[in-house]
């Protein structure tokens, strides 16, 4: 028909090519609809049991990820206070039973109260020293008590010996008192010196015992 109408051969060839291309082109909307229909048909063609397994697996994965995220958050943000509370609750020993705590507190506070009482009521001088010495001698052992008694007896003997020595030297200074009286006086003075040395040694031992008795409660 084109040839009969007087159309050239080149024009006829161009029209043929356009018609062929038009036949080969398909609309895109139809292709997308076909793909969606194919996927839906595939999903519907799956086994229902397999679908349930896939849903269960997905739920488990979501729950595990939530647990992991919460754990990481606790470690990064809330680790310090939780660790502190754990140490305070689980690593503290059990409280004392009954009145044991009260007795322990009283034993710890009593020495401080005793020292304050002595300082307040003027017991720092001789009274405080005597009270401390008596308390130490009573708390240490009976030997310390005997040593305290021996110390008082030593003071009385010392006063008596000093008086006797003074009288002996007065007799020596008087006329006719240089004989046996002078020798006896010198002997008595030497004996007094030995007695003083012995008593000083006993006093040193007593000081050691008193020091041990005073330090023992602090070490305990």
Swiss-Prot record:
<feature type="compositionally biased region" description="Basic and acidic residues">
    <location>
        <begin position="185"/>
        <end position="194"/>
    </location>
</feature>
<dbReference type="InterPro" id="IPR020850">
    <property type="entry name" value="GED_dom"/>
</dbReference>
<protein>
    <recommendedName>
        <fullName>Putative GED domain-containing protein DNM1P46</fullName>
    </recommendedName>
</protein>
<feature type="region of interest" description="Disordered">
    <location>
        <begin position="18"/>
        <end position="46"/>
    </location>
</feature>
<feature type="compositionally biased region" description="Basic and acidic residues">
    <location>
        <begin position="28"/>
        <end position="38"/>
    </location>
</feature>
<feature type="region of interest" description="Disordered">
    <location>
        <begin position="173"/>
        <end position="194"/>
    </location>
</feature>
<feature type="domain" description="GED">
    <location>
        <begin position="54"/>
        <end position="149"/>
    </location>
</feature>
